[in-house]
Amino acid sequence: MRFQSIMMLTITCAGTCLAEGLAPSDQAYRPTMTGLKSRLNDPRPLSTATIATSSERFLRFDTVARDTAGNDEERVGPSWLAKVDGLMHKMVTSSLSAEEAQLKVWIQSQIHPRELFGVLSLGKRAAKLDDNPDFVQWLRLVKDFRANNGNQAFSDLDIYYLLLKTNSPEQLKLLFETLRHTPGMTKIGASMEKSLSGNWIRKALEQDTYPTIVYNTLRLKDAGTKLDDTPMFRQWLEYVEKYWNKNAGAFFGDTQMLTLFQKTMTEEEDIIKLVHMLRNNPGMKSHADKLERYLLLTSESSHKTMADVWLKARETPEEVFRILRLAEKQTAAADDNRMLNLWLRYTQTYRDKIDKNAFSDAEALQFFRKAKPLDFDWEIV
């Protein structure tokens, strides 16, 4: 078969390098940034097993039937296979190392880095930021692809969110710093660091750019459940604060912000955790409290989850009382009663799980009466 013929050519190409003393195919790669840097500069070819496996995955790729989640392995059609077949024949007759030959095949085939990411299954087995040879080769392809097609053809944000699927923001920060100090990779490393620096805030403020537009421009929806960990989200929160200070009474408010979060994360628990996290930001604390109360009033299912989040954060009954703003007179007595009952239940749970000496029933009632004298609108049950 044509596929088997190409595979034999790939293995033949790798065999030449094996004779020169390659490491065993099962050699472990140390998960260190030093290892990554050395691989980026190391002219040695890949192991036979790695080349054969990577090439096999490459040859099975079909750009028409591609899953954006990284499950990109479908059989190719005759035209794609013939194109790669010809390229592989040319590589066999060259004096390039197996690693260089493989990279040249990818470059000449004009495969997109996002597609190759799926072909190599980097999304499945994680693009660990170490000396993984497939990942190193992918970085080299990205560099060449951007040089030939411009950075916007595969932008810094494209790279960031693709790698964020399998790595933490801290790991990515270290990767880009390493690339900036790696010969041949300094340009892409510097570009990535600049894109994550937050230099855009001043210009966006000058233009009074609507926060939703900024959110979408930064593609924060792509961060998913890692939204809170991404530097761009922290920068966006800073921008929103400054936007509010500059544009008092701006249309963009708490509910618009919550809508963005709900479009980014589908699970209510993740949204509640994110909203409560906003309380750690002094400029966002009051907005977070409003959002928590809004969620409690509009979603019965949020009550238990919210209480669990409070418990995990070890919020005291006094602090939860302030979050619920029970000392304030509300427009609807029924809402007040719901919030009061929620607070009383939380106080009991806090006493059971956190501090058995905190707030007896009598103390809770005394605290409440002191904070808000009872009137006829209230019914404690």
From Swiss-Prot:
Region feature WY-domain 5, mapped onto this chain: 302-354
Region (WY-domain 4): 251-299
Major localization class: secreted
Region (WY-domain 1): 97-150
GO cellular component: extracellular region; host cell cytoplasm; host cell nucleus
Keywords: Host cytoplasm, Host nucleus, Repeat, Secreted, Signal, Virulence
Location of the motif ATG8 interacting motif: 372-381
Signal peptide positions (record): 1-19
Motif placement: RxLR-dEER: 57-75
Subcellular location: Secreted; Host nucleus; Host cytoplasm
InterPro entries cross-referenced by the UniProt entry: PexRD54_WY, RXLR_WY
Residue ranges, annotated region (WY-domain 2): 151-198
Induction: Expression is induced during host plant infection.
Record carries keyword Repeat: yes
Mutation effect (W378 to A/V/T/S/R/Q/P/N/M/K/H/G/E/D/C): Impairs the interaction with ATG8CL
Keyword RNA-binding on entry: no
Quaternary structure, from the entry: Interacts via its C-terminal AIM with host ATG8CL.
Assigned protein family: Belongs to the RxLR effector family.
Function noted in UniProt: Effector that specifically binds host autophagy protein ATG8CL of the ATG8 family to stimulate autophagosome formation and subsequent autophagy rather than blocking autophagic flux. The pathogen remodels host-microbe interface by co-opting the host autophagy machinery which plays a key role in plant immunity. PexRD54 competes with the autophagy cargo receptor Joka2 to deplete it out of ATG8CL complexes and interferes with Joka2's positive effect on pathogen defense.
Entry text on domains: The RxLR-dEER motif acts to carry the protein into the host cell cytoplasm through binding to cell surface phosphatidylinositol-3-phosphate.
Protein name: RxLR effector protein 54
Species annotation: Phytophthora infestans (strain T30-4)
Highest classification ranks of the organism: Eukaryota, Sar, Stramenopiles, Oomycota, Peronosporales
